[in-house]
């Protein structure tokens, strides 16, 4: 049993799980996302280089990955601080920051934000998708990768003494690469030793979550302490979703606020809107999965911040929750989704 057993590890240290309150389990506060830059068509190249102002805001919102400035969330720390204070004023208590190695994790900024806002912030250990892996990462053995993950939780990340409280988001592509497979195996090994929470970013195929769970299981992971992110863009078929739900992991709908005609990172995917997400959450509740549902926004670009006319980190609490109540999801179930389920997941075994 780990010395962390029964606690949640935030960037400010260990806290009692009961202190968290309403928790968003998949967000970003300080990161860069250049790895997913999508060059615009030649006829739109000029607007892609303009600053973020009202006249081009709609274009940037709909072409988020074709505007380089939009991908630099780490430039907006003061705006994010204001948003976290607003989140807290609207009943928020904690936020899981999913930025890992490869997309500019900054634990020192996370610590400062936690100190200045009073929001509990949990940082993620590990590696993002293969496209961000360094040659050193690719050369590591599973054992060496396991050591890295454990060190970031037990001793500190980014050359600091600030410790991560989860492993993830662990990035997976489709098809999965050999380097990503090793990271998944290392994740399972570290989790088996530490009893820590794990969260996964699956590739953009409905088969990806199934494959990932199988690899984790074979390597000794605790699936009951593991979250599968981005189900709203990954498993769209109802029958397939219910089949996946039987595998026992947490089921995360974490793109609330994202409503797109064209999803740049997966052009074949018809991105659902928030009403569809709510219907999926209600379906999972009706099927007896209410103890394993999590929700978030996965904010990772500037134009999703309130400063730039976006929905911000309080959208679920201020807009989505009232609509969920209207659609028959009870207060008790919402407390499970927002408080109890995150608490259970984030608590070390």
Swiss-Prot record:
EC number, as in UniProt: 3.1.-.-
Biological process annotations from GO: catabolic process; epithelial cell differentiation; regulation of appetite; taurine metabolic process
InterPro entries with a match to the protein in the record: AryldialkylPase_Zn-BS, Metal_Hydrolase, Phosphotriesterase
Binding of a divalent metal cation 1, residues: 26, 28, 169, 298
Reactions the enzyme catalyzes: N-acetyltaurine + H2O = taurine + acetate; N-propanoyltaurine + H2O = propanoate + taurine; N-acetyl-L-methionine + H2O = L-methionine + acetate; N-acetyl-L-isoleucine + H2O = L-isoleucine + acetate
Cofactor note: Binds 2 divalent metal cations per subunit.
Cellular component GO terms held in the UniProt record: cytosol; extracellular exosome
Keyword Metal-binding on entry: yes
Top-rank EC class of the record's enzyme: hydrolase
Cofactor(s) the protein requires to work: a divalent metal cation
SUPFAM superfamilies: Metallo-dependent hydrolases (SSF51556)
Keyword hit for Ribonucleoprotein: no
Protein localization: Cytoplasm, Cytosol
Binding annotation for a divalent metal cation 2: 169, 201, 230
GO molecular function: N-acetyltaurine hydrolase activity; zinc ion binding
Pfam family name, one: PTE
Family from the record: Belongs to the metallo-dependent hydrolases superfamily. Phosphotriesterase family.
Free-text function comment from the UniProt entry: N-acetyltaurine hydrolase that regulates feeding by catalyzing the hydrolysis of N-acetyltaurine into taurine and acetate. N-acetyltaurine has anorexigenic and anti-obesity effects that are dependent on GFRAL receptor and GDF15. PTER also acts on other N-acetyl amino acids (Met, Ile, Leu, Val) and N-propionyltaurine, but at lower rates.
Name this protein carries in UniProt: N-acetyltaurine hydrolase
